[in-house]
């Protein structure tokens, strides 16, 4: 495990409740919610109940930072929050981690047909050379539609190098993942300071997808209540400056796991989330906590699962809250803005109530209240913050508050891992340790991947329902793990790519562009998150260790390999699959390595 503390030295946020940490925290304590009925064509073709940032807030930020409005809505709130936590200081030596579920996906609206004509090798769209790569609307590897280029556009505003910019997209746990990544990189000695950003804005792409799952509530959501009937979406940005020294609130434990059960529904037992909670507490040396800040989406199965995880962890008597009624589910931003609120609650020794809660409606006991709850005074306080999401992902952070001065993190941690085997899939060939194990005389991906599946994989009818990226990862992992045995928590999965789920994003966007939002398919939408390929692999191979997705163009795997070694130490994993995987318009590449810890 990676023992040590990193400190929250500054924070900032923009939500549907307004701009600024103090403003948002004060609103929570008053019971004010930012979720309301919204009629906004940017967000949905029909009215929706959501936490949407007022146009006046965006207008003020554009006036301050970007009067020409060259930045997207997602980018402008990220720029503001980063600027707020950095203040007048320079960015020399600072690392940046940006978390987002869908980033600038709104740029795809009306442009999906252009992307289907994009050819990666030539950079051409339907025979026409693509626009300058910095143009947000330009199809290509430099398009701001992709999270990697989006992050670089933001980082360049502050003089932060691309090599010091990391981008994670782990569905609903993206924000907590980013905090965990930053903490580990600081404890490794690579950085002394890191900025963590979580950001997502709403649009038709997202709302139509969640509507297709019938998971949205027309009323303000009611987490854990017997009358809960679904979630509310939201948009927000939060940023924190994490440092090696400080006082006040620190992060002393972090853990990520996977259910290995289902790509769109949580475990029915709660064991995956429980594993994350247990590991985060163990890493921090904590045997109990003073407050629990859970994901609390107000969907039937999520809230049920969380109650079971709390029971498994023996924390059923600890005061619990969900912040979703205040902000909505802000996706990639949620883990960051909610961690910021948890830090404020520890500092002020008060837990904000969960609006709308009346009668417990989950199978296991939870200590939840709609009113504010005072936390113990005169002692160090601990909070456990959790999240879960599509792909079966789970995450937990352990926060501590103490008035003791002069604390600092421990000495840098050195860890190592060796490459046990390598699989390469491209050009209708599969190579294992440079030896061909399968090939097909066909350039068509679908012909190749179906034939490869029948040859190197066991029977699984669910394979044919997967999107192309998941099929590619499924086959590559089958070859890589052949004959390898491990415990379910002893193996992790850390992948990267340039295009992520873009191929399926295009399919989803084409449906709502050519038809209506109501025509969206849940069978398509579930694959519009890149980490879902990891979920499919985890289900097949019973992998309940860490799952993380990085946006990266590094096919050498040097970055993910270095980070995986840290993850293996933090999570006590013996093995970890690392890889780079891409699929777009029939073109594909997958390189997976199996690492073993020394």
State where each predicted segment sits.
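Internal active-site segments that recognize and position negatively charged phosphoryl groups
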Residues: 181
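Conserved functional loop/turn residues at catalytic and ligand-binding sites
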Residues: 190
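Conserved "HGTGT" condensation-loop signature of ketosynthase/thiolase-family condensing enzymes
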Residues: 1-163, 187, 203, 209-232, ...
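Glycine-/small-residue-rich beta->alpha transition segments that form the dinucleotide
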Residues: 200
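Short conserved active-site loop signatures built around small residues
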Residues: 175
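Active-site histidine-anchored catalytic micro-motif
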Residues: 178
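Glycine-rich, Trp-frequent "lid" loop and neighboring beta-strands that shape
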Residues: 168, 172, 591-594
């Amino acid at each position: 495990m990676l023992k040590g503390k990193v400190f929250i030295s500054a924070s900032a946020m923009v939500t549907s409740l307004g701009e600024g940490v103090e403003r948002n925290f004060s609103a929570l304590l008053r019971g004010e919610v930012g979720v309301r009925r919204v009629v906004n064509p940017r967000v949905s073709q029909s009215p929706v109940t959501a936490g949407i940032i007022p146009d006046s807030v965006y207008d003020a930020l554009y006036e301050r930072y970007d009067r020409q409005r060259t930045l997207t809505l997602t980018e402008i709130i990220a720029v503001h929050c980063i600027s707020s936590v950095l203040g007048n200081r320079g960015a020399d030596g600072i690392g940046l981690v940006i978390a987002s579920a869908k980033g600038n996906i709104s740029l795809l609206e009306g442009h999906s047909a252009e992307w289907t004509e994009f050819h990666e090798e030539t950079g051409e769209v339907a025979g026409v050379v693509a626009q300058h790569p910095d143009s947000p609307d330009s199809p290509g590897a430099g398009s701001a539609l992709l999270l990697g280029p989006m992050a670089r556009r933001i980082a360049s505003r502050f003089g932060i190098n691309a090599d010091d910019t990391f981008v994670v997209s782990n569905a609903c746990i993206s924000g907590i993942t980013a905090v965990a990544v930053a903490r580990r990189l600081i404890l490794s000695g690579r950085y002394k300071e890191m900025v963590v950003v979580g950001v997502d804005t709403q649009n038709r792409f997202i709302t139509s997808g969640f509507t297709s799952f019938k998971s949205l509530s027309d009323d303000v959501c009611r987490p854990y209540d017997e009358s809960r009937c679904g979630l509310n979406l939201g948009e927000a940005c939060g940023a924190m400056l994490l440092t090696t020294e400080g006082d006040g609130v620190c992060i002393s434990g972090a853990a990520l796991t996977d259910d290995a059960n289902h790509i769109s529904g949580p475990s029915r037992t709660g064991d995956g989330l429980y594993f994350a909670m247990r590991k985060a507490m163990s890493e921090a040396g904590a045997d109990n906590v003073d407050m629990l800040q859970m994901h609390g989406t107000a969907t039937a199965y999520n809230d049920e699962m969380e109650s079971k995880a709390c029971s498994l962890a023996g924390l059923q008597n600890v005061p619990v809250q969900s912040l979703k009624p205040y902000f909505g589910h802000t996706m990639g931003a949620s883990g960051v803005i909610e961690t910021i609120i948890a830090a404020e609650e520890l500092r002020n020794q008060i837990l904000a109530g969960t609006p709308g809660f009346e009668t417990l409606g989950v199978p296991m006991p939870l200590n939840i209240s709609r009113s504010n709850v005072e936390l113990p005074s005169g002692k160090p306080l601990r909070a456990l913050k959790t999240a879960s999401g599509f792909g079966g992902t789970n995450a937990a952070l352990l926060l501590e508050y103490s008035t003791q001065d002069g604390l600092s993190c421990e000495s840098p941690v050195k860890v190592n891992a060796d490459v046990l085997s390598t699989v390469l899939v491209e050009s209708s060939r599969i190579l294992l340790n440079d030896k061909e194990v399968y090939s097909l005389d066909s350039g068509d991906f679908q012909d190749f991947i179906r034939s490869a599946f029948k040859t190197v994989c066991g029977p699984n009818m669910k394979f044919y329902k997967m999107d192309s990226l998941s099929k590619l990862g499924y086959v590559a992992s089958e070859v890589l793990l052949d004959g390898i045995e491990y415990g379910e928590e002893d193996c992790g999965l850390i992948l990267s790519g340039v295009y992520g789920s873009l191929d399926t994003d295009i399919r989803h966007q084409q449906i709502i562009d050519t038809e209506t939002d109501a025509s969206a398919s849940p069978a398509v939408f579930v694959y519009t998150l890149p980490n879902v390929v990891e979920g499919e692999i985890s289900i097949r191979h019973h992998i309940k260790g860490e799952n993380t997705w990085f946006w990266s163009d590094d096919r050498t795997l040097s970055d993910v390999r270095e980070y995986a070694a840290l993850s293996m130490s933090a999570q006590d994993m013996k093995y970890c699959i690392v890889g780079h995987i891409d699929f777009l318009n029939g073109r594909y590449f997958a390189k997976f390595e199996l690492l073993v810890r020394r």
